[in-house]
Amino acid sequence: ASIMATDYTDGLALKAMKNIFTYLPAAYENGPHDAKAREQMATASTMAGMAFANAFLGVCHSIAHKLGAFHHLPHGIANAILITDVMRFNAAEVPAKMGTFSQYAYPHCKERYLECANFLGIQGKNDDEKFENFLTAIEELKAKVGIKKTIKDYGVDEKYFLDTLDDMVEQAFDDQCTGANPRYPLMREIKEMYLKAYYGK
């Protein structure tokens, strides 16, 4: 959903996503005993890397970078914890109008997420339901591979997390990935996402 995405990067990202949904559970469960699943995950990783090397990333990675730097949370786990909440943030119908990307009246991110859902064959009676079903599918995939629900579940100390929160927020706001996010976040919105990811819903 990066504002730098193109048809070229979209094709790579969509195929990588489909491989992940198809093969990650088997690669996780069967390890070295399922060479096909591991091969396809390696392919997905490479294709995703080619996509984001050209289209950049977004605020999910910005927030995750600081969780790694301050709290040593592995980057993939940090992104997995955050992803659906960031998607909800990005898909807001009428977010605050930002002057940074004046070519957009408002972000069109929900349409991009629905394109992803369509590519995976996820259905819904309307766009809102399809989007929610897509988020549910992501949460189910996370559960299959042992991703815990919150930052707190990974043993990050609450006091130290809160003590470092403002620094993480400022650094995430300034992170190079934030500028490519389809909805430009306010610092208080980044803070809300951190707190939600720490404590859960």
Ranges and model annotations:
Residues 1-55:
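Carboxylate- and glycine-rich phosphate/diphosphate-binding segment that chelates Mg2+/Mn2+
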Residues 2, 6, 10, 53, ...:
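Hydrophobic alpha-helical scaffolding
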Residues 8, 36, 129, 152-155, ...:
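Short coil/turn segments at secondary-structure boundaries
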Residues 13, 38-41, 131, 165, ...:
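Hydrophobic packing residues in well-ordered alpha-helices of helical domains and bundles
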Residues 14-25, 42-46, 60, 64-68, ...:
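Predominant activation on well-ordered alpha-helical scaffold segments within soluble catalytic domains
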Residues 46-79, 174-180:
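Glycine-rich phosphate/pyrophosphate-binding beta-alpha loops
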Residues 70-73, 77-160:
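Gly/Pro-rich interdomain helix-loop hinge
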Residues 160-201:
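Short, amphipathic C-terminal "tail helix"
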